Amino acid sequence: MASAAANNSSSAAYDAAETGGLLRRRNTTAAARGNAGEEEEEAEAVAPSVEQAFADKPVPSWREQLTVRAFVVGFLLSIMFNIIVMKLSLTTGVIPSLNVSASLLGFFLVRLWTAAIERVGFLKQPFTRQENTVIQTCVVSAYGVAFSGGFGSYLFGMSETIAKQATEANDPMNIKNPHLGWIIGFMFLVSFVGLFALVPMRKVMIVDYKLTYPSGTATAYLINGFHTPEGADLAKKQVRTLGKYFSISFLWAFFQWFYTAGDNCGFSSFPTFGLEAFKNRFYFDFSPTYVGVGMICPYIVNVSLLIGGIISWGIMWPLISKKKGSWYPETLPESSLLGLQAYKVFITIAVILGDGLYNFVKVFGYTIKGFIVMYKNKNSNTLPISDNGTPANATEEESFDDKRRNELFLKDQIPKTVAIGGYVVLAVITSGCLPLIIPQLKWYYILIAYIFAPIMAFCNAYGSGLTDWSLATTYGKLAIFVFGAWAGASHGGVLVGLAACGVMMNIVGTASDLMQDFKTGYMTLASPRSMFVSQVIGTAMGCVIAPCVFWLFYKSFNIGASDGAYPAPYTIMYRNMAILGVNGLSSLPKYCLTLCYIAFVAAFIINLIKDLVPERVAKYIPIPMAAAIPFYLGPYFAIDMFMGSVILYFWEWRNKDEAQSFGPAVASGLMCGDGLWALPQAVLSLVNVNPPLCMKFLSRAANAKVDTFLGN
């Protein structure tokens, strides 16, 4: 989200590897617009042309757009956003779009840079929207590696920590423990191939098909707005707001740390609704991060999360736990995947797969429909247009904006020999080198994946252009089942499936994200060459930064413990999907498979109903993917996010324009401050500096026992 996926896109809400992928894409358009609000509509109503407003400003060459300051700023922001995305991936997997924050902070830091240089008389090059787009692309592609790298899903799912939580395939053949060296190598091998997969198709997708790529378009409107006098003034106010809430969030996280000397200590374990509710994970944990995430995510996502938490932890799990001794053995520990934990994990997987299958069929259907329209009209000068595939006359007169954008977009060609040659060379290198890192992943598995990947990448990019949904994680899960079953359990099939997931997910997701970035560049007159180079440099940054950030978390915290601060929930789910593909379902407890079938079908049908009913009704129907996330984790973070929605709702009710302009800045500040505290917290942990206090809450009876014990 992700590769640059985390980046562009109504998923980029949220499975750090899964729901992050799909739901984030469902959310980003609204989030990426951020302060723009209804800017697209306003632009059409107020100004006849965006590009005429910039007509007196020369467009720098593609080399001039690639400045040192852009990549210095990009590097600094990449570190910050990698920390934030990594923390989100390893806690709940709910990752919102950070496009607004990246664009806003990139704009602010370079403006600060240019103002300082200008004062001493050394300013040689003004800050342009093209350079802003380069920064945006670099940052998003860098922190996208924290998502597509699978640190909260397939990659850490290979580890012994997660394998011990599963009941099968936990032998050495199916385990690969993380180490910084091989992780960086793995990232470099799998992250770049997708950049070359669809480069030859950029003219077809952007100019000929006129695909909208809503997230890319929204980001372009945002950047164009920053570089008008009015937009620059608003951006300064937004940055001040972001800085204010960043400071509040960071200081609050620092204050909380003093009270977390043991397990279940501190404000994050505050039994807001009572101790019984706390046992079922119903509480508000005072996390600024998830209040901020809730302010960015659409209302329906946050409501879906809360509904999912109530259905699972309020109804289903308490009822199933009463069947202990009947449906599963009484003696099993709570974390055993032969007991209650199996219902939590596999019913969640069933909902994710049901939702994913439906959206795969839906987006694939849109893609086929677009091709049919194009074929029918190939001799009548019409082309399918983005939103609904309806034909638009190709001979109708182009607007000034379209002429200007087409001219510059087609000016700096990326040679097809470079794109095709790059893909082939990288595919060969990866096929030869990946087995050195993961011997179970044979070279011919990788080669087969790379042969079919461009077709899947094209379908995904086309569907993403139509609907703003990237199904990269769905293609990744498909690879888990196909390659895991091919290899078999005795030949490391679980490890093969997880690694193949990474290969496929990176190619398909990165190709789609690059098209989103090309769309942003198209609308800001940034050269495709500068966009491509920025994406390559940003990805290279991410391949180093993301593993280093993960390693810091891995060495500092107990990652993967289901009851810890960093449970990495999707790691166990991805590993169990791989086990499912290799071994089947024979070991599941009683009625677990039946409930999984029901959950799978329910997710499919709810999505179908949501698309069939009128929009005024559909907007109130929960999203199954979002509802599934708290099935495993509990509803505590959903309560935080719902609070974010409540804050934003009342703000919009009081002053809608102000809320639309400053809501994303407040949310970004809350997320960035709390997220960035993880860095000094990790450093303190590494040097054995521990919190001095433990704040815990006990029932009256438990407190009396403690007093009696201490009194003796």
Swiss-Prot record:
<keyword id="KW-0813">Transport</keyword>
<feature type="transmembrane region" description="Helical">
    <location>
        <begin position="180"/>
        <end position="200"/>
    </location>
</feature>
<dbReference type="InterPro" id="IPR004813">
    <property type="entry name" value="OPT"/>
</dbReference>
<feature type="transmembrane region" description="Helical">
    <location>
        <begin position="666"/>
        <end position="686"/>
    </location>
</feature>
<dbReference type="GO" id="GO:0016020">
    <property type="term" value="C:membrane"/>
</dbReference>
<feature type="transmembrane region" description="Helical">
    <location>
        <begin position="242"/>
        <end position="262"/>
    </location>
</feature>
<feature type="transmembrane region" description="Helical">
    <location>
        <begin position="478"/>
        <end position="498"/>
    </location>
</feature>
<feature type="transmembrane region" description="Helical">
    <location>
        <begin position="446"/>
        <end position="466"/>
    </location>
</feature>
<feature type="transmembrane region" description="Helical">
    <location>
        <begin position="631"/>
        <end position="651"/>
    </location>
</feature>
<feature type="transmembrane region" description="Helical">
    <location>
        <begin position="300"/>
        <end position="320"/>
    </location>
</feature>
<dbReference type="Pfam" id="PF03169">
    <property type="entry name" value="OPT"/>
</dbReference>
<keyword id="KW-0472">Membrane</keyword>
<dbReference type="InterPro" id="IPR045035">
    <property type="entry name" value="YSL-like"/>
</dbReference>
<keyword id="KW-0812">Transmembrane</keyword>
<dbReference type="GO" id="GO:0035673">
    <property type="term" value="F:oligopeptide transmembrane transporter activity"/>
</dbReference>
<comment type="similarity">
    <text>Belongs to the YSL (TC 2.A.67.2) family.</text>
</comment>
<feature type="transmembrane region" description="Helical">
    <location>
        <begin position="345"/>
        <end position="365"/>
    </location>
</feature>
<feature type="transmembrane region" description="Helical">
    <location>
        <begin position="418"/>
        <end position="438"/>
    </location>
</feature>
<feature type="transmembrane region" description="Helical">
    <location>
        <begin position="93"/>
        <end position="113"/>
    </location>
</feature>
<keyword id="KW-1133">Transmembrane helix</keyword>
<feature type="region of interest" description="Disordered">
    <location>
        <begin position="25"/>
        <end position="48"/>
    </location>
</feature>
<protein>
    <recommendedName>
        <fullName>Probable metal-nicotianamine transporter YSL11</fullName>
    </recommendedName>
</protein>
<feature type="transmembrane region" description="Helical">
    <location>
        <begin position="532"/>
        <end position="552"/>
    </location>
</feature>
<feature type="transmembrane region" description="Helical">
    <location>
        <begin position="593"/>
        <end position="613"/>
    </location>
</feature>
<feature type="transmembrane region" description="Helical">
    <location>
        <begin position="70"/>
        <end position="90"/>
    </location>
</feature>
<feature type="transmembrane region" description="Helical">
    <location>
        <begin position="138"/>
        <end position="158"/>
    </location>
</feature>
<comment type="function">
    <text>May be involved in the transport of nicotianamine-chelated metals.</text>
</comment>
